[in-house]
Design a protein with these regions (language model features):
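Extended serine/threonine-enriched, polar tracts that run as long, contiguous segments within proteins
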Residues: 119-204
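OB-fold ssDNA-binding interfaces and closely related basic DNA-contact patches used
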Residues: 1-132, 187-190, 202-204, 255-259
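Sequence-level detector for tyrosine residue identity
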Residues: 18, 33, 61-64, 114, ...
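Long, highly charged low-complexity segments enriched in Glu/Asp and Lys/Arg with interspersed Ser/Thr
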Residues: 65, 71-73, 188-251, 259
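Generic serine detector
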Residues: 7-10, 75, 79, 140-143, ...
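Polar/charged alpha-helical tracts
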Residues: 4-8, 85, 108, 112, ...
Length: 259
């Protein structure tokens, strides 16, 4: 048994176990490039597209208000029916920030009380180099996931990625290719160009790759399950500090142009 396993069993570093810390993969919406962000450090990916496998689906809500003087974001959960913690970040005099847990509720309950909240699909994603990252899908990119056949025909668009799979197919059985898809949107009196993520169904994985992907799905599931159990064991009055939640602090581009 190694020291990391012993440390987890002993509980001496439990405070750091509330967060599954992996790089965030996002599409820069104005310039159309993919980037990885971790601990406020950004790495621009040079490729026009990113290829990998979807491992685990989660969701989150957030809002960027008053030019950043007030930011709302929730914990990350498996579905909108789960109970989320809602976190508020406000900026006081001298730029000092105050972070507070202000509410709890399902996605629907929180949206009713805080209508500015926007939904984000989070996907733990295995890159071709075997690095696990967290893909953030928001705004117009969401329609490229969920668009129905009827909506696609009405909008002259592709059917949403999730609706391109047969009943006996699983998303983790196939490579997923992410591309920057250009579109125009009217902002005030001007029309601006933005980018959203286009999802392309790649090749079906061979048996060897599928075995590795299966092990990574289990790894992510076990890690998130351990975090959930640790939070539950603390009780509501002893919930972890807000700084340990599974999210980087939201930035303006996360919400500014969401529909």
């Amino acid at each position: 048994m190694n020291k990391q396993e012993l440390s987890q069993m002993s509980g001496e570093n439990q405070g750091g176990d509330y967060k599954f810390d992996v790089p965030m993969l996002t599409l820069e919406g104005e310039d159309g490039y993919f980037r990885l962000t971790q601990n406020k450090q950004e790495t621009k990916l040079g490729d026009d597209e990113v290829k990998g496998v979807m491992l685990k689906f989660r969701c989150q809500y957030g809002a960027y208000l008053n030019e950043g003087e007030r930011i709302l974001f929730t914990s990350e959960e498996d579905s909108a029916q789960k109970v989320f913690d809602l976190i508020e970040i406000t900026t006081g005099k001298g730029g000092k920030k105050f972070t507070t847990r202000i509410d709890r509720g399902t996605g629907k309950e929180l949206k009713e009380k805080y209508p500015d909240l926007k939904f984000k699909q989070m996907v733990y994603f295995l890159l071709d180099d075997d690095q696990i990252v967290k893909l953030q899908i928001k705004g117009s990119s969401l329609s490229n996931l969920y668009r129905t056949k009827e909506q696609a025909e009405a909008e002259s668009e592709d059917v949403g990625y999730f609706n391109q799979f047969g009943k006996d197919e699983y998303k983790f059985e196939y490579a997923t290719i992410l591309q920057a898809n250009q579109y125009s949107k009217k902002i005030g009196n001007k029309t601006k160009t933005f980018y959203k993520i286009k999802f392309v169904k790649g090749e079906k994985l061979d048996d060897a790759r599928m075995e590795f992907v299966g092990s990574q799905i289990k790894y992510v599931f076990d890690r998130l399950q351990a975090i959930a159990e640790l939070k539950a064991s603390r009780g509501q009055e002893e919930q972890p500090p807000v700084e340990t939640y599974e999210s980087e602090e939201p930035s303006p581009e996360d919400y500014e142009y969401q529909e």
